[in-house]
C-alpha cells in the first residue's frame, strides 16, 4: 500500500494526466508546492513500486496499477468533498478538511460514506431535513 505522501503524488499525477494529457516533474512540483528534486525522488520511488514508469528527461507515464490507484484516489477525494458539502461544511473549509482526513479513513469507511452520499442524492427530502437541522443550531468558528 502506498504511503499518504505517495497517494498525494499518485492522485496529482493522475489528475494532471487527465486534464493536460501529461505530467512533468515541474508541473507536479508546482501543484504540490514542493521542490522538483523532491518530486524526482518520489517519482523514482513510485517507479520502483511499479505505479509509474519514469525516464529522466523524457517524462513519466502511469502503469495500469498507477492509473487504477490514481482514479480511485481522485474519486475518494471527490466523494469526501461531496460528503462534507452535504453535511453542511462551509465550502471554504472543504478542501483543507478533505486533505486532512482522506489518508486516515479505511476503504470500508469510504464505501460507507459513499452510501450516505448516494442516500442523500436519492432522497432530497432527507437532505432538506438535514439542512433544516443545521439552521437551528448556532454556528461555531472552528
From Swiss-Prot:
GO biological process terms, semicolon-separated: intracellular manganese ion homeostasis
Entry binding sites for Mn(2+) 2: 11, 77, 99, 102
Recorded GO CC terms: cytoplasm
Subcellular location(s) of the protein: Cytoplasm
A GO MF term: DNA binding
Presence of keyword Nucleotide-binding: no
Activity regulation remarks: DNA binding is strongly activated by Mn(2+).
Keyword annotations of the record: Activator, Cytoplasm, DNA-binding, Manganese, Metal-binding, Repressor, Transcription, Transcription regulation
Gene3D superfamilies, per the entry: Iron dependent repressor, metal binding and dimerisation domain, Winged helix-like DNA-binding domain superfamily/Winged helix DNA-binding domain
Domain HTH dtxR-type: 1-63
Annotated positions binding Mn(2+) 1: 8, 99, 102-103
Annotated InterPro entries: DtxR_MntR_Metal-Reg (IPR050536), Fe_dep_repressor (IPR001367), Fe_dep_repressor_sf (IPR036421), HTH_DTXR (IPR022687), HTH_tscrpt_reg_MntR (IPR022897), Iron_dep_repressor (IPR022689), WH-like_DNA-bd_sf (IPR036388), WH_DNA-bd_sf (IPR036390)
PANTHER family named in the record: IRON (METAL) DEPENDENT REPRESSOR, DTXR FAMILY, TRANSCRIPTIONAL REGULATOR MNTR
Family membership noted in the UniProt record: Belongs to the DtxR/MntR family.
Its biological purpose: Central regulator of manganese homeostasis.
Subunit relationships: Homodimer.
Identification of the protein by name: HTH-type transcriptional regulator MntR
